[in-house]
Regions:
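General beta-strand structural signal in soluble alpha/beta enzymes
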Residues: 5-6, 46-48, 73-77, 98-99, ...
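Gly/Ser/Thr-enriched, mixed-charge loops and adjacent short helices
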Residues: 2, 109-257
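Proline/glycine-rich low-complexity loops and linkers
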Residues: 76-78, 127, 131-146, 150, ...
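Buried hydrophobic positions in well-ordered alpha/beta secondary-structure cores of metabolic enzymes
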Residues: 8, 46, 84, 97, ...
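N-terminal small/polar loop signature for handling phosphorylated ligands or for N-terminal nucleophile
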Residues: 28, 32, 43-108, 216-277
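Short glycine-centered, acidic/aromatic-flanked micro-motifs in structured strand/loop junctions
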Residues: 46-50, 203-205, 278, 363, ...
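An N-terminal, well-structured beta->alpha segment
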Residues: 1-68, 75, 94-95, 170-201, ...
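Phosphate-binding and adjacent anionic-ligand microenvironments
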Residues: 108, 263, 304-497
């Protein structure tokens, strides 16, 4: 078993499918693929977050990258992923290798790769690297010397593992702070002026590595920030580092209300996802935040309004409804920002967004960047004179209120089983499934004229089936949860002999 390719990079369970040695072999294959593609050895930045064995993996990656032909290697502790993308885009490196599992639980770790011009590797390069990784794993055998057995390490074990690995490797150790400062300065420079509206905010870093960077941005905006979970921790303080989970947003929402703050910001473990919370402690869904920022850019004539907008198949339908008013094309892509970045690179779109707080705007770069999104939000609040809560309420009044739902069902299913299970679940909830438009951009998606929709797709990282959808708020209370439950039962029935 090896790390599996995910929506962004490669992920595995620590001590099992993820080991520092395996991460180093993967890094070597990525460098090899990039060398073959570019015709020369890349300059490489190696970053790592606070997860177990991350430092050990990063140190072995430094050696592996050097051995594979990298021209220069720098290692940076706690480098947020959007900052790494910015640095590659700015020409400080041709490749960033980041030891992180992003929003996944603390039992996971992995490797993300960012190439020129500051985004995930293009699809062909990623496939080539993955094929080389397969070859490398077969050559290494099932149990390479020095890899952990899968049993949990204690602190002494981890300290010994972290202590070694670079005695004969040439590298430069760098502090992330100056690069974070450069990134924030770049983001603010892309606005007509730095927004001038002091606010009280709550920032929850979920004990990952991006909370302190978001605090730096708040300082630059003259926002007074209350920090939560802004000190990195290997177990993320017992809270999942995924802001899309309601439980992970709860303490920020409570703090916003207790502190009488204007808004809250919750970022994921490596900083490439952000959720906003309004002054009433209510979550602003990512597609609502995306729509607000798109409308603001449209009014202020920012960006390239002649270009399209891209969303993933799991993104709320509000963005399509909004863009239809402006006659802007919307391109729907599979889940994973690696499917949206190429459209930014090609100039076909000037903004892209997913369903989990992963937003990008062309003025800031070609990869998702919560720092850019928050800077735009600051500009919106300063120029509109309205609160985030008021802006969202107006948006819902004009375009309708939909309840978002997302759930997970264990086990696998074929496309046919997903299609049949979705139809069965929709009919149990009172829909006429025969009237649905079915698309297969990623999994099976049912869309209705009412704006409601249901998507069933296999998870690329943790396995099982992801269930997403939006239902009108006027439906009976609990309708979204009931639909998710019907999907689970229908899938179980489809799998039964």
């Amino acid at each position: 078993m090896r790390m599996r390719r995910s929506a962004d990079g490669w992920r595995g369970l620590i001590g099992s499918t993820f080991t520092p040695e395996r991460a180093a072999r993967l890094a070597a294959t990525i460098v090899t693929a990039v060398r073959a593609h570019d015709g020369g050895g890349p300059r490489v930045v190696v970053g790592y977050d606070c997860r177990r064995l991350g430092r050990r993996a990063a140190r072995l990656i430094v050696r592996a990258a050097s051995d594979a032909g990298a021209r220069a290697v720098r290692i940076v502790e706690h480098l947020p992923t959007p900052t790494a993308s910015y640095l590659v885009g700015a020409g400080d490196a041709e490749l960033a290798l980041l030891v992180t599992a992003s929003h996944n639980p603390p039992e996971w770790n992995g490797v993300k790769a960012k190439g020129r011009p500051g985004c995930p590797l293009d699809a062909e390069l990623e496939r080539r690297a993955d094929a080389l990784f397969d070859d490398s794993e077969r050559a290494a055998g099932d149990a390479p010397f020095g890899e952990p057995s899968g049993e949990p390490f204690d602190q002494a074990d981890e300290a010994r593992a972290d202590a070694g690995g670079l005695d004969d490797a040439i590298f430069e150790a760098c502090d992330a702070s100056p690069w974070i400062d450069r990134h924030i300065a770049h983001v603010l420079s892309r606005l007509p002026a730095t927004p001038d509206l002091p606010l009280r905010v709550v920032v929850d870093g979920l004990s990952g590595i991006a909370g302190s960077a978001m605090l730096h941005l708040c300082d630059a905006l003259r926002w007074s920030a209350t920090p939560l979970g802004c000190a990195p921790s290997a177990d993320f303080g017992g809270v999942a580092p995924d802001p899309s989970l309601p439980a992970s947003r709860r303490r920020a929402a409570e703090a916003v209300c207790a502190e009488h703050a204007d808004l809250g910001l919750v970022v994921d473990g490596d900083g490439d996802r952000v959720y906003a919370i309004d002054s009433d402690g209510r979550t602003v869904e990512p597609h609502e935040l995306f729509a607000l920022l798109l409308a603001h850019r449209h009014r202020r004539r920012y960006g390239h309004p002649e270009r399209g907008v891209a969303v993933t198949a799991a993104t709320g339908a509000l963005v399509q409804r909004l863009c239809a008013r402006w006659s802007r094309p919307v391109i729907e892509q599979p889940v994973g920002f690696k499917h949206l970045s190429p459209l930014l690179v090609e100039g076909r779109i000037d903004a892209g967004g997913g369903s989990v707080g992963d937003l990008a705007f062309a003025e800031f770069g070609v990869d998702r960047d919560p720092f850019g999104a928050v800077a735009l939000l600051a500009d919106l609040l300063a120029t509109s004179g309205q609160s985030l809560a008021a802006l969202v309420a107006d948006l819902r009044h004009r375009y309708g209120r939909f309840d978002w739902h997302e759930s997970h069902v264990n086990g696998d299913a074929t496309d046919t089983q997903l299609r049949d299970a979705g139809r069965r679940a929709l009919e149990r909830c009172g829909f006429d499934a025969r009237t649905a438009r079915i698309t297969t951009v990623d999994g099976i998606k049912f869309s209705f004229d009412s704006g409601e929709w249901l998507l069933l797709r296999p998870s690329t990282t943790e396995g099982g089936i992801r269930v997403y959808g939006e239902l009108l708020s006027t439906r009976a209370a609990g309708a979204a949860a009931a639909l998710a439950a019907h999907v689970a039962r229908a899938l179980a029935a489809e799998r039964s002999p």
